[in-house]
């Protein structure tokens, strides 16, 4: 596995290339089951932050918070207290109060959790608010991509070992009202599973992969939260193998997945799913790729670059690949004039030989 080129602050990344992101200072130790999120700033001049929450290694679970301050490209380790140790949990930011960081579920060494905790802007400690309604049973539920507006959507999750919870209901946590609800759904829902990705895009939620016992899944489901009807999608193209413990991000009309565990071991492949054409495409890279991994975390990173419209030539248009990319060139130029490109950011995870990672890797979305 070759070394990745380092992407320095405000550098414009090349297409089809993986980079290492190397902030100054001491970052998190190698771990699995953590979550990561990009947190924007209310100040236009700010580049925002990346938060990494919790996780675990063979010695136990973490309750720490690590931050990449993108303005100074440094790690920050705040002294916030009160986060219960947990891994393979969910995290999200509510749209109506974007300063609040929420976590749900996960596990520690003795048991699974189903509690909700929140960190308010400027607060020194996490709070465990009293919530209304009936929450899902304790479970692992590893995602940071399953929220729409103020609502976290929960489907499936882990019970113990390789077994999922038997519950196949959909649950909604509304951060604005701090209330759990369980909507009535129709259609063809996924069977019980854990280690799947649950990704929100617009009003829809997409479920891919996961596992139950020794069975790995490669199917794709969708539920529109306006109609609450499940649909099993008939996808085509470069179908990803059956896998679990992978990660996902949504951008434009696409869902990207990276890594995970298959029946033959961990992978470092990346796929793009077009939600409009139902087409999967395996992405190819001109550089080395990050080491294969599972149980890592991934988020969408708006990356501010030195503004230079001449750089548009460095981002070749792939319009011939899919018809809905015909305006790629003009969109690319506009993005570069604004000085922003969108990256996929991954941190941590492990391979099937037990090696844990503590690296930050990025690639531009295409």
Curated annotation (Swiss-Prot):
Pfam families: Kelch_KLHDC2_KLHL20_DRC7. Keywords: Kelch repeat, Repeat. Kelch repeats lie at residues 49-95, 100-146, 151-200, 204-253, 254-303, 343-366. InterPro entries: Gal_Oxase/kelch_b-propeller, Kelch-typ_b-propeller, Rab9_kelch_effector. It comes from the Eukaryota. Transmembrane segments: none annotated. Rab9 effector required for endosome to trans-Golgi network (TGN) transport. This is Rab9 effector protein with kelch motifs. It comes from Xenopus laevis. The gene is rabepk.
């Amino acid at each position: 596995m070759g070394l990745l080129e380092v992407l320095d602050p405000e550098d414009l990344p090349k297409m089809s290339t993986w980079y290492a992101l190397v902030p100054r200072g001491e970052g998190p130790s190698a771990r699995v089951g953590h979550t990561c999120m990009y947190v924007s700033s209310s100040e236009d001049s700010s580049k925002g932050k990346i938060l990494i929450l919790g996780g675990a290694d063979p010695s136990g679970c973490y309750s720490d918070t690590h931050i990449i301050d993108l303005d100074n490209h440094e790690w920050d380790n705040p002294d916030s207290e009160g986060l219960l140790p947990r891994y393979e949990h969910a995290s999200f930011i509510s749209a109506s109060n974007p300063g609040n960081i929420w976590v749900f579920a996960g596990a520690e060494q003795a048991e699974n959790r189903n509690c909700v905790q929140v960190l308010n802007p400027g607060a020194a400690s996490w709070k465990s608010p009293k919530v209304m309604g009936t929450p899902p049973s304790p479970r692992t539920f590893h995602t940071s991509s399953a929220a729409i507006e103020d609502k976290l959507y929960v489907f499936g999750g882990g019970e113990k070992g390789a077994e999922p919870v038997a519950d196949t209901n959909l649950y909604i946590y509304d951060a604005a009202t701090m209330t759990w609800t369980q909507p009535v759904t129709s259609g063809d829902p996924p069977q019980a599973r854990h280690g799947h990705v649950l990704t929100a895009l617009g009003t829809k939620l997409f479920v891919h992969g996961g596992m139950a016992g020794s069975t790995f899944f490669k199917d794709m489901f969708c539920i529109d939260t306006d109609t609450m009807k499940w649909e099993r999608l008939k996808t085509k193209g470069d179908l990803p193998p059956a896998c679990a413990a992978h990660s996902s991000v949504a951008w434009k009309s696409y869902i990207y997945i990276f890594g995970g565990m298959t029946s033959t071991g961990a992978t470092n492949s990346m796929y793009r799913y077009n939600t409009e054409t139902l087409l999967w495409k395996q992405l190819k890279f001109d550089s080395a790729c990050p080491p294969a991994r599972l149980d890592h975390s991934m988020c969408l990173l708006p990356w501010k670059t030195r503004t230079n419209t001449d750089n548009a030539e460095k981002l070749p248009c792939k319009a011939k690949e899919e018809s809905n990319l015909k305006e790629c060139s003009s969109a690319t130029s506009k993005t570069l004039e604004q000085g922003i490109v969108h990256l996929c950011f991954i941190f941590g995870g492990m391979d099937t030989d037990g090696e844990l990672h503590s690296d930050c890797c990025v690639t531009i979305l295409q």
